[in-house]
């Protein structure tokens, strides 16, 4: 276990129950802008999930996509806030969810796990994968 993950658990275990309970899980929320939209496809997202899960030591389970693949042209999404790919990668301890917006060159990523993980590694890898020029990050301890 990396040092920062061990520190997260150690701090949680030392907190008296009357103050803040030990976290149930951890959620990293990443809002990425100025992305390379060529990374917004099933093949690229498969690669992202594999690399991310390996980097933060999570076991991949089922994965699902929601996009316009196989949808007739006249039924495909055309609005900037809906045209893109969404994917859910279930992991043994919860999930990684990605929503991409092709026309806005934006990606929204949620990484949630009952197990602690290195959020700095996850953020760096995600920002690099999507080639984002900007990344807004929120980290939540779920109790």
Where do the PLM segments sit?
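Polybasic/polar functional segments that serve as interface/processing modules
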Residues: 1-143
């Amino acid at each position: 276990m990396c040092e920062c993950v061990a520190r997260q658990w150690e701090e949680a275990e030392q907190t008296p129950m009357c103050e803040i309970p030990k976290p149930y899980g951890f959620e990293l929320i990443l809002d990425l802008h100025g992305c390379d939209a060529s990374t917004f496809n099933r093949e690229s997202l498969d690669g992202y999930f594999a690399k991310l899960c390996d980097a933060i030591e999570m076991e991949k389970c089922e994965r699902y996509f929601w996009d316009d693949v196989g949808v007739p042209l006249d039924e495909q999404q055309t609005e900037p806030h809906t045209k893109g790919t969404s994917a859910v990668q279930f992991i043994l301890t919860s999930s990684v969810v990605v929503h991409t917006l092709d026309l806005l060159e934006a990606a929204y990523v949620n990484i949630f796990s009952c197990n602690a993980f290195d959020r700095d590694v996850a953020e760096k890898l995600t920002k690099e994968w999507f080639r984002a020029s900007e990344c807004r990050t929120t980290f939540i301890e779920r109790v």
